């Protein structure tokens, strides 16, 4: 009987330790490299899209990219839903006219500027970035750390 309790307790400890290492994001979000992402088809201006993202989950913002691989992952989620449409990303000079920064405060490490150069959209098929008036409306992608 003591052996049964010992084995049962051991299995319980293993189960509980593994249960916290699984998906820690909502089921309607996608994950990549410890972050969660969700494409929203509803069109909003940049400021409203950012505000909407902050209301979806703690520390959620419009998407920021640290690498081309992350941008490719987001494109793989946006293109099937939006085809060739543009989406708002978190890069903009809304709060700081001289320095572009991501809306979540991270520094700009990766960029994919088009030949054009206010608020920034990303083309869902090839990750090219385009400036657009912040008052225009586009679909958008939100991101938070899992």
UniProtKB/Swiss-Prot annotation:
<dbReference type="Pfam" id="PF00059">
    <property type="entry name" value="Lectin_C"/>
</dbReference>
<comment type="subunit">
    <text>Heteromultimer; disulfide-linked.</text>
</comment>
<dbReference type="GO" id="GO:0005576">
    <property type="term" value="C:extracellular region"/>
</dbReference>
<dbReference type="InterPro" id="IPR016187">
    <property type="entry name" value="CTDL_fold"/>
</dbReference>
<comment type="function">
    <text>Interferes with one step of hemostasis (modulation of platelet aggregation, or coagulation cascade, for example).</text>
</comment>
<feature type="disulfide bond">
    <location>
        <begin position="53"/>
        <end position="142"/>
    </location>
</feature>
<dbReference type="GO" id="GO:0090729">
    <property type="term" value="F:toxin activity"/>
</dbReference>
<comment type="similarity">
    <text>Belongs to the snaclec family.</text>
</comment>
<feature type="domain" description="C-type lectin">
    <location>
        <begin position="32"/>
        <end position="143"/>
    </location>
</feature>
<keyword id="KW-1199">Hemostasis impairing toxin</keyword>
<dbReference type="InterPro" id="IPR016186">
    <property type="entry name" value="C-type_lectin-like/link_sf"/>
</dbReference>
<dbReference type="InterPro" id="IPR050111">
    <property type="entry name" value="C-type_lectin/snaclec_domain"/>
</dbReference>
<feature type="disulfide bond">
    <location>
        <begin position="119"/>
        <end position="134"/>
    </location>
</feature>
<keyword id="KW-0800">Toxin</keyword>
<keyword id="KW-0732">Signal</keyword>
<keyword id="KW-1015">Disulfide bond</keyword>
<keyword id="KW-0964">Secreted</keyword>
<protein>
    <recommendedName>
        <fullName>Snaclec stejaggregin-B subunit beta-2</fullName>
    </recommendedName>
</protein>
<dbReference type="InterPro" id="IPR001304">
    <property type="entry name" value="C-type_lectin-like"/>
</dbReference>
<feature type="signal peptide">
    <location>
        <begin position="1"/>
        <end position="23"/>
    </location>
</feature>
């Amino acid at each position: 009987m003591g052996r049964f309790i010992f084995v049962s307790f051991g299995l319980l400890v293993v189960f509980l330790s593994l249960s916290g290492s699984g998906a820690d994001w909502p089921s309607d979000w996608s994950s990549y490299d410890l972050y969660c992402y969700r494409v929203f088809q509803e069109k909003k201006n940049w400021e409203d899209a950012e505000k909407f993202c902050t209301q979806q989950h703690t520390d959620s913002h419009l998407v920021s990219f640290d690498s081309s691989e992350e941008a490719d992952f987001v494109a793989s989620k946006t293109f099937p839903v939006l085809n060739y449409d543009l989406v708002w990303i978190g890069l903009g000079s809304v709060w700081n006219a001289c320095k572009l920064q991501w809306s979540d405060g991270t520094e700009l490490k990766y960029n994919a500027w088009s030949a054009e150069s206010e608020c920034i959209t990303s083309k869902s098929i090839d990750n090219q970035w385009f400036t657009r008036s912040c008052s225009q409306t586009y679909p958008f992608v939100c991101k938070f750390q899992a």
